[in-house]
Amino acid sequence: QEQMGIFKEMQNNGFFSFVSSYRASNSGVFGNMYHLMNQYDPATGKFGLDNTTEAMNAYLQQAEYRNTDWFDLLFNNSISMNHSISMSSGTEKAQYYASFSFMDDPGWYKKSNVKRYTSNINALYNISKKVSLNMIGNAAYRKQQAPGTTNSSGINGVTGDVSRNFDINPYSYALNSSRTLDPNAEYQRNYAPFNIFHELDNNYLNFDVVDIKLQAELKYKPIRTVELSVLGAYKFSTTTQVQTITENSNQALAFRAMDDATIRDNNSWLYKDPDSANSLPITVLPSGGFYQETKYKMNSWDFRATASYND
C-alpha cells in the first residue's frame, strides 16, 4: 500500500502520465494500465479498461493490495540426490577398483538444474616381482541449465555497479521488482512484452561439460634400492555453452519492436544505416530468435620419468 501511495503521488506530479508511460521502453503497473485503455476488442466493442477515474482507481487498487512475493514464486525448496557405487576385486597378480556416481540437483529456481555422471577405474598389474603396471581412467559428464544472460553493458566507476541488457537473473529480479506487479501479466521492457516466468522458459543456457583422463605408470625395480618409473597421462576436456533465445522471448521481440514512429525512433535495438542520413531504423531480426554456441576444448599430454634410490 505504501508503494502504491508513492506511485500515486508521483502520478499526481506528472511522472506517470499517459504520454510518458504508454511508449516508455520500460513500464510497470501504470504503463500496463494505459495499454489496456488503448486496447480495443472488435468482438465486444470495448476497450481493455475504461478511460474513467473509477476504472483506473479500481485497477490501481488491485495492484495496491497484490503484494507479490517474488522470492516465494521464483525460488523453491528442492532435494538433490547423489548416488554412488564402488567395486573392487583382484588377486596377487592383479587388483581392480571401479566406482560410478550420479548427482541430480533440481536447483532452487527455474532453469537451474544440474546432472552429473562420474566414473573411475583403477587397475594394478604385478607383472613380475620387479615390474608393475598401474592404469587409471577417469570420466565425468555434467549437464546444467541456467537463465539466459548477456555480457555486462557497463560498470559504474564510482559505485562498482554492473549493468546488463536483458538481465533475467531471478535473484536480482526478485530483489528489485515491485510487489504491485501481477506475476501472470506482461509488462513492458525494451519496448516489448515481458514476464519473468515466460522469459525463463524462452531464454536459457545449456552447459555440457566432458572431462576424460587416462593415465598409465610403469615401475621397474632392477635392484632392491633402486626404482625406475615412467608415467604417461592424457587429459581431454570440452565445455559447450549454448544460449537459446526463442522468437517469443523479450530479447528477440525487442529487436523488432517498432509499433509506431516514436518507438521506432527510440528503440536502440533497431538498425539505422550510417551511410544514409535520412534512412529509418529497421529490424535486423524480422522473425526468429538467437542461437549462440560457444565451445572450449583442451587436450594435454604429460610424460614423466623418475628414478629413486632408497637404502
What are these regions (language model features)?
Residues 89-93, 102:
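A generic beta-sheet turn/junction motif
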Residues 84-88, 99, 122, 215-217, ...:
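Outer-membrane beta-barrel architecture
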Residues 80, 91-92, 126-130, 221-223:
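Outer-membrane beta-barrel channels and translocator barrels
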Residues 1-67, 107-114, 118, 122-211, ...:
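Surface-exposed loop/interface segments of Gram-negative outer-membrane beta-barrel transport/assembly proteins
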